[in-house]
Amino acid sequence: MLFYITVTVLLVSAQAKFYTDCGSKLATVQSVGVSGWPENARECVLKRNSNVTISIDFSPTTDVSAITTEVHGVIMSLPVPFPCRSPDACKDNGLTCPIKAGVVANYKTTLPVLKSYPKVSVDVKWELKKDEEDLVCILIPARIH
């Protein structure tokens, strides 16, 4: 019996992701990557005065012709906007719009971690939106260092 419990715990741990889905309504998130951090990390350490690259593989459940990006740092339940270099996700982010339903798309962009950011723990909320509705919504636990 102890063997089965141990195997179950190991399988669940092996499948653990460093991000959580916070309401992806119009797409299925396939994978998320953050430069320099493995998927089994508990949090991402973001160094101030540097850049971090994020990639999100997803498949929309509906045809999509335009996607906007919103990024927030959530500190004590308060969302603080992060600067987004390209809010139009269909430009310079690896996406070719329109995207057909069921087709896996790869979004990739770079986020500046400004020197002015305080050294705090934060949940990075990354949203890709279609007509103000969440196509993709993920939360990434991070620590700004």
Swiss-Prot record:
Residues in the signal sequence: 1-16
Recorded superkingdom: Eukaryota
Disulphide linkage map: 22-137, 90-97
SMART domains documented for this protein: ML
CDD domains listed in its UniProt record: Npc2_like (cd00916)
Entry GO terms, CC: extracellular region
Glycosylation sites: 51
GO terms of molecular function: sterol binding
SUPFAM superfamilies in the record: E set domains
Subcellular localization, as worded in the UniProt entry: Secreted
One of the protein's GO biological processes: intracellular cholesterol transport
Keywords tagged on the record: Disulfide bond, Glycoprotein, Secreted, Signal
Primary site of residence: secreted
Similarity remark: Belongs to the NPC2 family.
Classification via PANTHER family: NIEMANN PICK TYPE C2 PROTEIN NPC2-RELATED, NIEMANN-PICK TYPE C-2C-RELATED
UniProt-recorded name of the protein: Ecdysteroid-regulated 16 kDa protein
